[in-house]
Structures are given as structure tokens and as C-alpha cells.
Curated annotation (Swiss-Prot):
<dbReference type="InterPro" id="IPR001683">
    <property type="entry name" value="PX_dom"/>
</dbReference>
<feature type="domain" description="PXA">
    <location>
        <begin position="97"/>
        <end position="284"/>
    </location>
</feature>
<feature type="binding site">
    <location>
        <position position="653"/>
    </location>
    <ligand>
        <name>a 1,2-diacyl-sn-glycero-3-phospho-(1D-myo-inositol-3-phosphate)</name>
    </ligand>
</feature>
<dbReference type="InterPro" id="IPR013937">
    <property type="entry name" value="Sorting_nexin_C"/>
</dbReference>
<dbReference type="InterPro" id="IPR016137">
    <property type="entry name" value="RGS"/>
</dbReference>
<dbReference type="InterPro" id="IPR037896">
    <property type="entry name" value="SNX13_RGS"/>
</dbReference>
<keyword id="KW-0653">Protein transport</keyword>
<feature type="domain" description="PX">
    <location>
        <begin position="570"/>
        <end position="691"/>
    </location>
</feature>
<feature type="domain" description="RGS">
    <location>
        <begin position="373"/>
        <end position="496"/>
    </location>
</feature>
<dbReference type="GO" id="GO:0035091">
    <property type="term" value="F:phosphatidylinositol binding"/>
</dbReference>
<dbReference type="GO" id="GO:0043547">
    <property type="term" value="P:positive regulation of GTPase activity"/>
</dbReference>
<dbReference type="InterPro" id="IPR036305">
    <property type="entry name" value="RGS_sf"/>
</dbReference>
<dbReference type="GO" id="GO:0032266">
    <property type="term" value="F:phosphatidylinositol-3-phosphate binding"/>
</dbReference>
<dbReference type="InterPro" id="IPR003114">
    <property type="entry name" value="Phox_assoc"/>
</dbReference>
<keyword id="KW-0734">Signal transduction inhibitor</keyword>
<keyword id="KW-0472">Membrane</keyword>
<dbReference type="Pfam" id="PF00615">
    <property type="entry name" value="RGS"/>
</dbReference>
Length: 968
């Protein structure tokens, strides 16, 4: 039974399943499962939603039930505030000048928009806070403008800034000297220089050192916060200052949003280098200065940057597919770049190996040095300084000073006697005062150098001294009264082995050559300005035209001479007919073909002659020496040491030389100087041109002639002064007395006695600020004051002898008085007034606005420049600075001194920490000038009192003062 029942169950079950599958299909199982899952999931979702709603209702009931009831006054007040917002009236007047207020208001608006509003509107829509900030800033600006109007800015711009800059430069110079004097063989790093700089600063300032502010960003921010808070106390109304939230907010905006970014930019060396290049952007690039910078550079990064750029340019030029005329230009450029690359590689290798070469010491080991004649030394300031130092060492300074004093006496006597004769010719009343003063001056020279009481005494023949004494006693003094003895003294200095011959073997002679720029190697082999042997008249040297000697031709009006430089060299003989460039034993130079026409009554002749630029230069020196009036009329085109084979340059020089020839051959010129024809005919004759001066002589003339011409100009200016005879005699008497007195003091104190070696004390001028060393008589003379400060500190003239420094001072005084007189002070004061005028202030504000917000939009951050670009900018900046230095300055203080001074100033700006120090010094001086009634000096001393260098200095003072106190 059971078996049958189970079979029936399984049978009926199977039948049901089969019928179910046949009826609903084979996927009914999946559908059924899906329906069940949806049912269960829907039930869970409904349960969760119902529970969430009930929970929120319960929590809301709990909150309202436990918290106290809300006061109805608060919502009411909020509604009233929103309904009637308090209006803040802002006066848009700031400085009283509309041209300043308008751009200044835009700066305030842009600042609030880009630095405050963008985050404030995410917190609140209330405008009152923004208006309060604007009102606070305007109040501060109004107080600042009012204070600025009451201040005389002329002393700050003409005195304080110059003193601060000069002192900063002095500290840097002394820090460099300390680094150099260290015994460590390892070269000092930039960190050592910065530390040494602040050590020197505290020694000089005594009461303040800014090392923490300049080297620690955290301390710098704290310093700026304290400073801004003090300024807000002075500029804001008491009510606004007592609002701490507002005060701290404005303080942070000023300190971190305005002052700190501005100081970061002003102290960035790369920014300063770009600004220097922009300031002198109009000056032409000097290739000689560029090569000097490369050869003198001790920064491997600079050399690598220049070398990589040269390699890049070489690759570009070699990839060009050119033919014809352009190929010569490209070859010249490639050769120039290869030379630059070679110089950079050799300099890098030398720096990496540590085998630095001192050019002066290296030249001293060479036997072949340029010979500078004694007469050239005596007329050049730079050369005379070194010869004077040598004569002091050998004890022959009395001979040199006697020669110089006699030269001064001769010039003075000639001028005064000419004035005396001119007044006699005019029939004016004369006195014997002039001759009496000349006699007194001559007797003073005799007593100081030649008498038996003279110490030291100039050793010359006794009969010459006796003859001079007799002349002084019985005859009127003449300018030539000392000529015989002066000639003997000159021969003694020239031939005595103790003096000039030994001087040529001394290290001072090599240093003199360096200052005269006569140790310099030629930087480029090919040169149009070559100083070698002149071309022999034709390209092949085989043309010999049978012409009469032009030197025998007179300057009669019947003979007419015309000459011009043709476009190309004579085609039958010139292999470079287009370029006019020749090559002789590997040396490339340009050759100019001159077509000459000579006409007279019966015949006409024409020929070609060939001259180099060096021939023109030698010819120009010849005729200007013989005919001084031509020096102001004829102007020869200047030299170009590097890359002077360029086609455009050669064409320009050809035009300039043509203009020079036409002016020279003008009939009026020939009539004015009849003897000039001989020199012109000799130059234009078709034969090898014989130079009257060699390489060295022309270089000597280059630095001697400017000084000689300047002395002539000063002499002419003195002669043309419209003084009366009494005034002239009085001035002469004063000058002669001062000359004799000062010269005697200098000889006794500075030259005849060796100064004792004593340690530096607090009274040492080098350990004081620059302003503490100015003469009282030049304190009111603004231009002379500025020039003396800059000359002293930039070129370190205090290390030179006092004769040169006094000579430079007198030269500057004569230059200023002859050029402007007393009006230059007035012009400087007017310029300061113009700088602080409303128009210029408005222009500065507009430039600031346009720089930070071009077209009203905040400028994007400037991307950081690549290191190689910054290094090339450094090289370009140094090259520009060296190129703008006039040759006249080199002739006064020396080429080597000029180079060192310029590079010292440039190197000073390459340290961010030192630039920061200078910016803060200027800022402190500005605030001390703006608020003279407040004790800003004491405030800054307190703010910088945590300086580590200051603490070390105080400890050092205590240790040095302790023994002296114990003795007491």
C-alpha cells in the first residue's frame, strides 16, 4: 500500500510539473524567483522609509522640547537690519589731486576685488565689512599723503639715498677683502660672503645688524608685521586702530600681500639684471667688453650658458643652405662663434682645475713688455700715480715733485703774464703785484727743493743752483726760470738706474700697464683695424705706376685734387672684388680702394691707391698733432675690435671714410692750412704707406691725447675768464699759497714718512658710514658730493695715493663748474621737485596699476626663468655696464680699476640677502624722513636687536673692554 501510494504521489507530482512547464514555459522558475526577490526588497524599502520619517519627527519633537523658547526680538532685529541697511558714505578724495586719486581708487578697488571679495562672499553677502576696509585704507592713505606734502624730499634723494648706497657698497667691498685675506685655500662660497657681510655691517653700524631679517623668512615676516602695526597706529584713527580684527586683517594684507611680494621682486638678482639691461638698452653692444667678461668670469654657470647658446647658434648656421655672397657672412659668424666657444671651454677647464692665472703676475714673468716712455708717464694721471708710488719707495720722490711743481709754476706764470701783457696793450693801470707773487712762488720752490735747508734736497749741479739763486735775486721771474734744472732732473730720473730703468723691472710697472689696458691679448685674429704692416699700395704688390712724387706738388690753386673710395677693389688684381677683404698670412683685413684725380692747367692724372683703416688712423693722428684746429673739425670713424668683417659694417665705414676725405680735400680746408697738402699728397700717393707711429705709439696716443686735450680746454677756459686783474692776482696768490702749503704737507706727511702700523680703531674712517667722511666744503655741492661718493666706493680710490684722489676731485670740480656752474644744484633740486610732483606720482601709480592689473585683470604670476637664461642675462648685464664706461674715465683712474669697480657693483647685486638688506635700509630711511618727530631709529634698533651678529659683536666688545677695566 505504501509503495503504491508513494508512486501515485510521484506520478501526480511529475505530471503537475510537466503540465506547469508546458503551460508557463521553461523560464518560469527564473521569473518566480525574481518576483519573490522584488517582493521582499520592496517590503524592506517601505519599512526603512517609514522608520526614517518617524525618527525625524521624533527628533524634532525632542529638540523643541528640551531647548528654551526663542526670543522673538532676535528675528525681529535681523529683519530690520535687512530691511534698512546702514549706508556708509566714502569720500573718494585721497591726496587732494584728482589726477592721483582716480588711479589710486582703481588700485584700491582691484585690490579688494582680487584679494578680499573672492573669499568673503562665500561667507556673507553683507557689504558693510568691505566698505569698512575700504574706509580704513583710505584713511591711512590720506594721512600718508598729508605727511608727504609736509616733507622736503630733496635731502632724502640727494643725501640719504646716496649715503646708504655708498655705505652698502663699502660693507660689500670690505667683506670681499676679508674673504680674500683668509688663509683657506678653498674659495669662499656665497654663504661665507653673506656671513662676512653682516659681520662687517655690525662693525660699521655699531647699533644695528639686519642679518635675521634678510636671511630668515620667519623673522622677516615678523618684522614686517611689527612695522605695519606701527604704521597703522600712526596713520589710522584711534577708533579703527582699537578694532583688533580690522587691524590684524589690514596688517596681514599690507605685510604679506603687498610689502613682502614687492621686496621679493626688488631683491631678486635676475630682476635687477633685467632692469639694468632695460635702463641701458639704447647703448650699442661692445664685443670687446663681451670677450673681456667671458675671460674674466669666475662663474662656471655663466660660461656654460654662453657656450651652449654658441653651440646652438653654430648648429643653426651650419644647417642653412646658402650660396653666393651670404656664405662669406655666415663663415665669419661661424668663426666668431667657434672662437667664443673655445674661450668658454678653456675658461671652464681652468676654473674646474683650480689653476687660476693672475694676468699681472703672468705678464711680469715675460721679458717682452710694452715700453712706456717717461715723458708719457709724466703727462698721464694713471701712469704717474704708479711712478709716484715707486719713487716714494726708492726715495726719489723729491725729484718727481720738483718736476711736477715746476710744471705747475710754468703754466700759472704763462697765464698770468699773458693777462698782464694784454692789459698793458690795452693801456690799463698795472701794478707789480703779479711779478711779486710769481717771485714769491719761485722763491718758495727754490727754498723747498734746492736750498741747503731743503729736506730732502734735489741733487743737481751746484752751479745751476747758484745761477738760479742769482736770477731770483736780480731779475724778474719768467716761466722758463727753472727749465735748466728741470731738464737735469728729468735726465736724472730717466737715466739713473734707481729710478725709471728700475721702475720698468718692477711689479708696479706691470700694474701700470694693466691699468693702461696694455696687457690685453688680441681677442680676434681677423681685424680690419689691424696694426700690422700696411698694405703695399696694391693687392698684388706688383703695380708700380711711374708718377711724380706728389710731395713736391705745391698747394697752388691751379692744382686740384679729388679722391673718393670706390665701391670695390681694383678688379684686375683683387680676388675678393665684392667684399674688399684680403688675407695675408692668415690675417684677414679690409682694404679700401681710393680713386685719386689730380688736375692742373695742362694735364689730368688718375690712379688708384689702397689703404687700410689703420693707415687712415695713423694719418689722422699725424695731421691732428700738427694742426690742432683740425681735431674739432675732422672726425674719423671709430674702431670696432670684434666682428668687423661684416658687410653692413664695411659699407657704413666706407661711407664715413668717404665723407672724411671730402671734408679733408675741401678747398676751404686746404686754404686754411697750406702745409696740410704735403701730408695729404703723401697719404694718397700710390706707394706703400709709411706709418709715422707704430702699434704702441698709437695706443699711447689713445690714452694720452684725451688728457692733453682736456688740459688745453681747461687752460683756454681759464684764459677766457673775465676777471679783473686784482681778482686774478688774488686767486693766483691763494692758489699758489695753497699749492705750496698742501704740497709741503703731503710731502712731509704722506711721502717722506712711512705711516706707523697701528690696529684699526673705532675712529678708522673705513669703519664708519660714508657720510661721516665728507668734507664740509663739498657738503652743499650736490653733484660733486654724489660723484665723490660713487668714485670713492665704486673704484676704491681711498686705496690709491692722495695725490690721485685730490687730482680727481679737482678735475670733477672744474668739470662741473665749467659745464654748469652753480646752476646744476638748482637743476638737481628742480628734478627732485619734478619727481615728487602730482603728475609724476600719478604716472607712477598708473604704471603700478597697469603692471599688476593689465586691462583691469590681475596679472598672472611670472613663470620662473630657466637657469641658463638667467646666466646669460648676467653676462649681458655685465657686458652692457662695461661697454657704457667712457674711455675718458679709464684714462683718469685706469682701465683695470674701472673694470674691477664696475664688476664689484654688479656682483653686489647678485646676492638676494644683500639686496634685501639694501631694500630695508632704503625703507628705513624713507620712514625716518616721513616721520621725523617719531623715534624710528630706536624702533628699528629694537626690532633688529635679536640679531646673532649683534650679540656676537657685543660679546666681543665686552671681552676686549674687560682687561682695560681690570687695570683701572
Amino acid at each position: 500500500m505504501l509503495t503504491e501510494a508513494s508512486l501515485s504521489i510521484w506520478g501526480w507530482g511529475s505530471l503537475g510539473i510537466v503540465l506547469f512547464l508546458i503551460t508557463f514555459g521553461p523560464f518560469v522558475i527564473f521569473y518566480l524567483t525574481f518576483y519573490i526577490l522584488c517582493f521582499v526588497g520592496g517590503g524592506l524599502v517601505v519599512t526603512l522609509l517609514f522608520g526614517k520619517t518617524n525618527s525625524e519627527k521624533y527628533l524634532e519633537q525632542c529638540e523643541h522640547s528640551f531647548l528654551p523658547p526663542t526670543s522673538p526680538g532676535v528675528p525681529k532685529c535681523l529683519e530690520e537690519m535687512k530691511r534698512e541697511a546702514r549706508t556708509i558714505k566714502i569720500d573718494r578724495r585721497l591726496t587732494g589731486a584728482n589726477i592721483i586719486d582716480e588711479p589710486l581708487q582703481q588700485v584700491i578697488q582691484f585690490s579688494l576685488r582680487d584679494y578680499v571679495q573672492y573669499w568673503y562672499y562665500t561667507l556673507s553677502d553683507d557689504e558693510s565689512f568691505l566698505l569698512e576696509i575700504r574706509q580704513t585704507l583710505q584713511n591711512a592713505l590720506i594721512q600718508f599723503a598729508t605727511r608727504s606734502k609736509e616733507i622736503d624730499w630733496q635731502p632724502y634723494f640727494t643725501t640719504r639715498i646716496v649715503d646708504d648706497f655708498g655705505t652698502h657698497l663699502r660693507v660689500f667691498r670690505k667683506a670681499q677683502q676679508k674673504i680674500t685675506e683668509k688663509d683657506d685655500q678653498v674659495k669662499g662660497t656665497a654663504e661665507d660672503l653673506v656671513d662676512t657681510f653682516f659681520e662687517v655691517e655690525v662693525e660699521m653700524e655699531k647699533e644695528v645688524c639686519r642679518d635675521l631679517v634678510c636671511t630668515s623668512p620667519k623673522d622677516e615676516e615678523g618684522f614686517l608685521r611689527d612695522l605695519c602695526e606701527v604704521l597703522l597706529y600712526l596713520l589710522l584713527p584711534p577708533g579703527d586702530f582699537q578694532n583688533k580684527i580690522m587691524r590684524y586683517f589690514v596688517r596681514e594684507i599690507l605685510a604679506r600681500g603687498i610689502l613682502l611680494p614687492l621686496i621679493n621682486q626688488l631683491s631678486d638678482p635676475d630682476y635687477i639684471n633685467q632692469y639694468v639691461i632695460w635702463m641701458i638698452r639704447d647703448s650699442n653692444c661692445n664685443y670687446e667688453a663681451f670677450m673681456n667678461i667671458i675671460k674674466l668670469s669666475d662663474n662656471i654657470g655663466e660660461l656654460e650658458a654662453v657656450r651652449d647658446k654658441a653651440a646652438e647658434e653654430l648648429q643653426y648656421l651650419r644647417s642653412l643652405d646658402t650660396a653666393g655672397d651670404d656664405i662669406n657672412t655666415i663663415k665669419n659668424q661661424i668663426n666668431s662663434l667657434l672662437f667664443v666657444k673655445k674661450v668658454c671651454d678653456s675658461r671652464i677647464q681652468r676654473l674646474q682645475s683650480g689653476k687660476e692665472i693672475n694676468t699681472v703676475k703672468l705678464a711680469a714673468n715675460f721679458g717682452k713688455l710694452c715700453t712706456v716712455p717717461l715723458d708719457s708717464i709724466l703727462v698721464d694721471n694713471v701712469a704717474l700715480q704708479f711712478f709716484m708710488d715707486y719713487m716714494q719707495q726708492t726715495g726719489g720722490q723729491a725729484h718727481l715733485f720738483f718736476w711736477m711743481t715746476v710744471e705747475g709754476y710754468r703754466v700759472t706764470a704763462q697765464q698770468q703774464l699773458e693777462v698782464l701783457l694784454s692789459r698793458q696793450r690795452d693801456g690799463k693801470h698795472q701794478t707789480n703785484q703779479t711779478k711779486g707773487l710769481l717771485r714769491a712762488a719761485a722763491v718758495g720752490i727754490y727754498e723747498q727743493y734746492l736750498s741747503e735747508k731743503a729736506s730732502p734736497r734735489v741733487t743737481v749741479d751746484d752751479y745751476l743752483v747758484a745761477k738760479l739763486a742769482d736770477t731770483l735775486n736780480h731779475e724778474d721771474p719768467t716761466p722758463e726760470i727753472f727749465d735748466d734744472i728741470q731738464r737735469k732732473v728729468y735726465e736724472l730720473m730717466l737715466r739713473d738706474e734707481r729710478f725709471y730703468p728700475s721702475f720698468r723691472q718692477n711689479a708696479l710697472y706691470v700694474r701700470m700697464l694693466a691699468e693702461l689696458d696694455m696687457l690685453k691679448d688680441p681677442s680676434f685674429r681677423g681685424s680690419d683695424d689691424g696694426d700690422g704692416e700696411s698694405f703695399n699700395g696694391s693687392p698684388t704688390g706688383s703695380i708700380n705706376l711711374s708718377l711724380d712724387d706728389l710731395s713736391n706738388v705745391s698747394s697752388d690753386d691751379s692744382v686740384q685734387l679729388h679722391a673718393y673710395i670706390s665701391d670695390t677693389v681694383y678688379a684686375d688684381y683683387d680676388p675678393y672684388a665684392v667684399a674688399g677683404v684680403c688675407n695675408d698670412h692668415g690675417k684677414t683685413y679690409a682694404l679700401y680702394a681710393i680713386t685719386v684725380h689730380r688736375r692742373n692747367l695742362n694735364s689730368e692724372e688718375m690712379w688708384k691707391t689702397y689703404r687700410r683703416y689703420s693707415d687712415f688712423h695713423d694719418f689722422h693722428m699725424r695731421i691732428t698733432e700738427q694742426f690742432e684746429s683740425l681735431s674739432s673739425i675732422l672726425k674719423l670713424p671709430g674702431k670696432k675690435t670684434f666682428n668687423n668683417m661684416d658687410r653692413d659694417f664695411l659699407e657704413k665705414r666706407k661711407k664715413d671714410l668717404n665723407a672724411y676725405l671730402q671734408l679733408l680735400l675741401a678747398p676751404e680746408m686746404m686754404k686754411a692750412s697750406p702745409a696740410l697738402a704735403h701730408y695729404v699728397y703723401d697719404f694718397l700717393e700710390n706707394k706703400a704707406y709709411s706709418k709715422g707711429k707704430g702699434d704702441f705709439a698709437r695706443k699711447m696716443d689713445t690714452f694720452v691725447n684725451p688728457l692733453r686735450n682736456s688740459m688745453r680746454n681747461v687752460s683756454n677756459a681759464v684764459k677766457s675768464l673775465p676777471d679783473s686783474l686784482a681778482e686774478g692776482m688774488t686767486k693766483m696768490s691763494d692758489n699758489m699759497g695753497k699749492m705750496s702749503e698742501r704740497l709741503g704737507q703731503d710731502i712731509k706727511q704722506s711721502f717722506f714718512k712711512v705711516p706707523p702700523l697701528i690696529p684699526k680703531t673705532d675712529s678708522d674712517p673705513e669703519h664708519r658710514r660714508v657720510s661721516a667722511q665728507l668734507d664740509d666744503n663739498v657738503d652743499d655741492n650736490i653733484p660733486l658730493r654724489v660723484m665723490l661718493l660713487l668714485m670713492d666706493e665704486v673704484f676704491d680710490l681711498k686705496e690709491r695715493n692722495q695725490w690721485l684722489r685730490r687730482n680727481i676731485k679737482n678735475l670733477l670740480q672744474q668739470l662741473i663748474r665749467a659745464t654748469y656752474g652753480d646752476t646744476i644744484n638748482r637743476k638737481i633740486v628742480d628734478h627732485v621737485d619734478w619727481m615728487t610732483s602730482p603728475e609724476q606720482v600719478a604716472d607712477s601709480v598708473k604704471r603700478f596699476r597697469d603692471a599688476f592689473w593689465p586691462n583691469g585683470i590681475l596679472a598672472e604670476a611670472v613663470p620662473c626663468r630657466d637657469k641658463s637664461i638667467r646666466m646669460r642675462t648676467r653676462v649681458a648685464g655685465k657686458t652692457k655696464l662695461l661697454a657704457i664706461m667712457p674711455d675718458e674715465l679709464k684714462h683718469i683712474i685706469g682701465a683695470e680699476t674701472t673694470r674691477k669697480g664696475i664688476l664689484r657693483v654688479f656682483e653686489m647685486f647678485q646676492h638676494n640677502q644683500l639686496n634685501r638688506r639694501m631694500v630695508y635700509v632704503f625703507l628705513e630711511g624713507f620712514l625716518e624722513t616721513l616721520f621725523p618727530q617719531y623715534k624710528f631709529r630706536e624702533l628699528f634698533n629694537k626690532l633688529h636687536s635679536r640679531s646673532k651678529q649683534m650679540q656676537k659683536y657685543k660679546q666681543k666688545l665686552q671681552t676686549t673692554q674687560a682687561p682695560s677695566l681690570q687695570k683701572r
